[in-house]
């Protein structure tokens, strides 16, 4: 019997190593190899051997500091990797299918070879020889089947890895797109702040010039008063000198010399009076000029304050428009409309008590938890943990200013801490107690500002924004919660 050789393709699969980017299913002719392309570090998420359970907070923060140009370049690189991953996936699937079919063919051959048949007379005569040949054939087919099975299993593993890689790249692309949007928003915010800072500086300069003008006016006014006192004194002395000259005393030796001396003194006083009067007039002119400068400085200050107020109003409008646009882009127009409704209704003074709000929220959340998995909840918690309190407070300041809410810092940290604890432990009451205190002091608009700041501060996902808007809605009324339920299909 001719020797049958097995020419089936070998399948190799190299394990992914930390800090490497796996590219599976690369066809090298006779083998399928799962190779590693280095260069993508700290890529997390999705579990498995690739990169750990999730991307670290430090990595997210580092990427978040990139410029828009860096993020766009990163996007292009990710797109190229995504295309390569799709090609690798298709190749891996094709190889898997081919090797699976080969395994089926070998198994069928083995079954046919092992099928019982009636021995002929010749077969019986050569039973020993036939038994040896049959055993050799059985061993060959068993070996071929084992090899084909291993190849098929390796191909299946390569296919699963290619699919996982494709999904991971898609997740990274979504994350990069979000970071790019946030970076572009940050750049726009910096430009806006620079413009606003110029207007703040204009007010400060105008205030400084007004203060300087007032100081100069006060100095000029003091100088006028001082010179008025001098003029008054010299005028009295002049009057006395005039009286001395007018009263002529004669009949004693040297009276003419005395008279001439008095007349010289009178002339000196007249000259002095003329001089101090001129000085007073000059001081009055300077004072009047300083008054004009103060008036002009007051006008400039008013203009600067008007310009600042106009920018702040525009800034407030732009902030909320940008906020609603962000929600629309990230979560859809219906969510944006709900957010606008909440902001509008927050202008009223009526709101539910902490017990009413908490009961409504818990009922809403229990239904919500059935729709979203623990993985979704962990993702939102990790997203919030990746944002520092100081970063969140910046968003809170903008939204509070846009909604004309003050005093937020006194509650800010308690709300931040209460939200994280609620997500982590499921105990939301401390947060609701803090929010009620805030609403009592500043109105329900404060709750809206506090909670909306979470939406723009972190990539929450649908479960996260549903929780945040649910908290706000529970204070305002059942109508808003019903809208959320309808939107989420729960």
UniProtKB/Swiss-Prot annotation:
Composition-biased stretches (Polar residues): 1-20
Disulphide bonds in the chain: none
Phylogenetic placement of the source organism: Bacteria, Pseudomonadati, Pseudomonadota, Gammaproteobacteria, Enterobacterales
Domain of life of the source: Bacteria
One annotated GO biological process: killing of cells of another organism
Compartmental location: Host membrane
Coiled-coil portions: none
MF term (GO), any: pore-forming activity
Chief location: host cell
Gene: cta
Native species: Escherichia coli
One Pfam assignment: Colicin
UniProt name for this protein: Colicin-10
Family note: Belongs to the channel forming colicin family.
Ranges that cross the membrane: 447-467
Entries under InterPro entries matching the protein: Channel_colicin_C, Channel_colicin_C_sf
Record-level GO cellular component terms: host cell membrane; membrane
Keywords associated with the record: Antibiotic, Antimicrobial, Bacteriocin, Host membrane, Membrane, Plasmid, Transmembrane, Transmembrane helix
